[in-house]
Structures are given as C-alpha cells and as structure tokens.
Amino acid sequence: MRTVVIAGGTRGIGGALAARLRAAGDRVIALGSADADLTSVRETAELVGGRLPDRIDALVLAAGRFDMRRVVTAEGLEQTFAIGVVSRYLLAERLRPALAAAARPVVLNLSGTGGIKAGRIHWDDPQLTRGYTMFKATMQGARANDLLGVAFAARESRVRYILYNPLLVNSGMHRQFRQPMRTLVGAAATVAGATVDGAAKPLVTLLDNPPDAPLTALRRGKRVSLSRQEFDTATATRFEALLKGVIAAV
C-alpha cells in the first residue's frame, strides 16, 4: 500500500485525486485548511516535523488560495505566495528523507509548466506590496513553482519531480473574480474545461508510473521542453536563495 500526501487534498483536483487513490487502495493523507495552516511557515514546519509518516511514496502539491484583495498572513507574507510557493517548497524539501525511504518516490506539483508569458518573478517585491492583483500573484506563483522543480531536481536524488499544468478546469475558481469576469470565466470553464475528476485521472497514471527523468514538465499530458528559459538553472538557484531569505525572516 502506498502512502500519498496531498496538500490541498480536500477539494478541487486534489480532492478528486484523493478519492481516486483511496478507491484504488492507497493510504491518502489529504491536507486541507482544517488540518494545517499552510500559509504559515511555522505550522508547515511543525506538520513535517511531527505529523507525517517516515515513508511517503508520493507528495502532491495542489494547495492554493486566491483573492482579489492583497491578504497578508500573520507572519507578514502575501497569502498567495505563502501557500502556493513557500509551503510547497517547505513540504518538498523537508520531506526529502521520507520520500527517499520509498521504493519509487515522486513529487507531483500542479504548477505553471512554462510558456506563461505573463508570469514573472517580482525580484524586488515578491510579496507584491505595490500594485497587487490576483492575476499578478497567481502568475508569479506559476512561474515560481516551475523554478522550484528545477531547484529540487538539481540536487541528486531518487525522487522524481513532475510539474503538471492541467490547463482549464471547472473547479469553481471563477467565483473569486468580480463581474463580468466571473461570468465569462465560469462560462468558459463550463464549456471547455475539464471536470475536477477528469483532471485527476491522468494524475493517477503519473503517480503509478512516474517518468524516469529527475524532472518532467507536462501541460495537460503533453511534454514541455526543459530547454525553455522558464527552466533556467541559474534563475532557479537565485529564486531558491530569495525564498530561503523570506523563510529565515519569518
């Protein structure tokens, strides 16, 4: 029996994936907001330190939070950055020993996976204290997670890291928008988007048979070349250093 930890595993794609894995007989630890405050560096560290098993076969990073307003956590971090970037980094890095104890360990990060021209790292203001928009925060997070995958895979490890963008999914995210965008995005998701269960199905296959490469990027199942500038190793190293500074300051 595999042990799978899913951050963001109580609703949306993560919840649908959790249901599929449980039905297949896997032990699933689904982390939602009631289980741990993943916007908090301290709570995330405590979660890793004492509440998760010593062997984890798969770690799925699907937690995220979006808000039209800039929300600051109790630790002074912008909320989207805290849960969508910082917590994912902490979980993957600090669970390395538990993952290494498994036979075929894999990290699956639902991320941007390159090609998002609007996504960029705001090096001088990663907390977006100036000119915050939900779109800007979300796109920075997508870009950041691609870099986290590069940084993780750069260190020799048996753990396979998969970056996966399911593209348009009818997950209800459109409810975060103001009108008329809420109606437009909701209609597009209903017509063209995959259901959360449909989006979860290929993820099961990836967890069952992870690629052999240390890092793989996929956009709705189609491979994305890691030679793209979005996966630049030097940029990933620079971003990880920035992130360590943010965490150390908390």
Please provide the spans of the model-predicted regions:
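Rossmann-fold scaffold of SDR-type NAD(P)-dependent oxidoreductases
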Residues: A7, R55-G64, L108-S111, I162
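Rossmann-fold cofactor-recognition segment
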Residues: I29-T44
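Conserved amphipathic alpha-helix within the SDR
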Residues: R42-R55
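C-terminal helical subdomain
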Residues: A144, S157-L163, T183-A249
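Short alpha-helical oligomerization interface
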Residues: M68-I83
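Amphipathic alpha-helical dimer-interface segment in Rossmann-like NAD(P)H-dependent oxidoreductases
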Residues: G49, I83-A103, V150, A154
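Catalytic loop of short-chain dehydrogenase/reductase
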Residues: M68-R69, A100, R104-R158, N165-M181
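N-terminal Rossmann NAD(P)H-binding glycine-rich loop of SDR-like oxidoreductase domains
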Residues: A7-R20
